[in-house]
Amino acid sequence: MQKVKVLQVCAWVLLLWRCWGVLGYPLDCKDEQGSIISCTSISLEKLLDRVIQHAELIYHVSEESCTLFEEMFVPVSMRTQQNRARNTCITKAFPIPGSKSEIQKISDKWLLHSVLMLVQSWIEPLVYLQKTLDRYDDAPDTILNKTKWVTNKLSSLEQGIVELIRKMLDEGLLAVDHQQTLTRFDVQPEVVESILRDYAVLTCFKKDAHKMEVFLKLLKCRHTDKMSCYIS
C-alpha cells in the first residue's frame, strides 16, 4: 500500500511539472514567430484555444486530485457522500443550465458568463481548501501544490474569459457576489467532518471544472462548425 502511495505521489509530481511547463505564463501568448505578446493582441481564435487549453488542464488536475484524495483519506464506506455532495455544491443556486438540452439552447453570451461565474465562485473556496489541507498530518505536498496551481490557473482563466467577453460580445461583465458561497467554510469542523467537507469541495469543483471545459468547447464549435455542435 505504501508503495502504491509513493507511486501516486511521483505521478503527481510529473503531472504538475508538465502543467507548469505548458501554462507557466497563461496570458502571455506566442505569435507565429515565437515572440511573447499580450493575449489582448492575439486573434480571437487563438485566445479561445488558449482558454480551452487552460480549462482542459484544470479539469484534468481536479479529476486526478479528487481521486488521489479519495484513495488516501476517504474510506470506501463513506464514498457515497459524493452523491450528496453533488446536491450541495456552492454553485448549485447559480442560474447555469445543467442538462445537455438546456446547454445546447443558451446563447454565446450566457456560455461565457456562466463560465465566468463558475471560475470566480471557486477561487476563494480553493484558497480556503489550501489552508484546511495544510492541517492534514499526512497530506502529501503534491496535493497542496496542486490546489495552489489550480487556484492560480483559475485566476488566469478568469482573465482570459474576461478578454473573450470583450472581444466576442463587446460588453462589460455581470457582477457576481461570492460572499454567500463562502459562509459554509467559516466553521472549523472535526477531523471526519473536515475530510468529508474537503472531499465534497473537490468533487463539486471537478464537476464544475468539467462544465467550464464543455461550455468553452461548445462555444468554439459554434464559431467553427455550426452544423454539428453536440455535447457528448
Curated annotation (Swiss-Prot):
Glycosylation site residues: N145
Superkingdom of the source species: Eukaryota
Listed GO CC annotations: extracellular space
Record carries keyword Protein biosynthesis: no
Keywords noted in UniProt: Disulfide bond, Glycoprotein, Hormone, Secreted, Signal
Cystine bridges: C29-C39, C89-C204, C221-C229
Signal peptide: 1-24
Protein's GO biological process: animal organ development; growth hormone receptor signaling pathway; positive regulation of growth; positive regulation of receptor signaling pathway via JAK-STAT; response to nutrient levels
Location(s), subcellular: Secreted
Protein family (similarity comment): Belongs to the somatotropin/prolactin family.
Keyword tRNA processing attributed: no
Name the record gives this protein: Somatolactin
MF GO annotations: growth hormone activity; growth hormone receptor binding
The organism of origin for this protein: Acipenser transmontanus
InterPro entries assigned to the protein according to its UniProt record, in alphabetical order: 4_helix_cytokine-like_core (IPR009079), Somatotropin/Prolactin (IPR001400), Somatotropin_CS (IPR018116)
SUPFAM superfamilies for the chain: 4-helical cytokines (SSF47266)
